[in-house]
């Protein structure tokens, strides 16, 4: 008996939709990262993108536990001297809630070339509507 290894041409990518309303950010991000990697499938192969597409709606209604809204700080740097910028989770949630979820999921993906392909399969929307109804996404229970 031989071990079956997934190939890029034979992988079937499904679409899932997740409602992020009143869901804790870290718990959502871990499960979404596993679906993006394909670890929920029996044909999971670390070197092949076996993951599925994930659409997250209601990103502005995500929950953070404890004092993370005020205490959690996100940093970015322009590359120039003195070019560091910081924003709290509360400020990021009010301005760009999609980016808050995207950064959380990105931190839980592997740090390699394949992670960029996996992150492209993540679609995050702040409202309840999304333009991916044609793909007939299935509801992903958390």
Curated annotation (Swiss-Prot):
The keyword Protein biosynthesis does not apply. One of its GO terms (molecular function) is structural constituent of ribosome. Pfam families: Ribosomal_L13. Transmembrane segments: none annotated. SUPFAM superfamilies: Ribosomal protein L13. It comes from the Bacteria. Keywords: Ribonucleoprotein, Ribosomal protein. GO terms for biological process: negative regulation of translation; translation. The keyword Ribonucleoprotein applies. GO terms for cellular component: cytosolic large ribosomal subunit. Belongs to the universal ribosomal protein uL13 family. This protein is one of the early assembly proteins of the 50S ribosomal subunit, although it is not seen to bind rRNA by itself. It is important during the early stages of 50S assembly. NCBIfam families: rplM_bact (TIGR01066). Part of the 50S ribosomal subunit. This is Large ribosomal subunit protein uL13. It comes from Trichlorobacter lovleyi (strain ATCC BAA-1151 / DSM 17278 / SZ) (Geobacter lovleyi). The gene is rplM.
